[in-house]
Amino acid sequence: MIQSFTRLAVADNSGAKELMCIKVLGGSKRRYATVGDVIVASVKKALPNGKVKKGQVVKAVIVRTKKEIHRDNGSLIRFDENAAVILDAKREPIGTRIFGPVGREVRYGGFMKIVSLAPEVL
């Protein structure tokens, strides 16, 4: 469950290491985001030679959350950290690699490129 000011790890090789959520997209009063949702975020920590710089405002899709996700079949899944993948203007990932597992809900959001790059989809 991600809301404004939540800090997230970055699960790709775009050069950013940490993001801070600014806004959850998808409705004027939407407060929380979960796996597969798009957020607007600020880069808080970045590598000096990366594609994105510190302070840059980016869009990102959430791929892991500490808060458990309840599935339709009755199971639930949770991860050890909150993580996101940075997107470009065409909703494609900026990075060329994805680190760590991603939730299956990312596929339902239409982010097939992230699903295909991920080492594991849970």
Curated annotation (Swiss-Prot):
Keyword RNA-binding assigned: yes
Subunit structure: Part of the 50S ribosomal subunit. Forms a cluster with proteins L3 and L19. In the 70S ribosome, L14 and L19 interact and together make contacts with the 16S rRNA in bridges B5 and B8.
Family: Belongs to the universal ribosomal protein uL14 family.
Protein name from the UniProt record: Large ribosomal subunit protein uL14
Biological-process GO terms, alphabetical: translation
Keywords associated with the record: Ribonucleoprotein, Ribosomal protein, RNA-binding, rRNA-binding
Organism placement in taxonomy: Bacteria, Pseudomonadati, Campylobacterota, Epsilonproteobacteria, Campylobacterales
Organism for this UniProt entry: Campylobacter lari (strain RM2100 / D67 / ATCC BAA-1060)
PANTHER family, per the entry: 50S/60S RIBOSOMAL PROTEIN L14/L23, LARGE RIBOSOMAL SUBUNIT PROTEIN UL14M
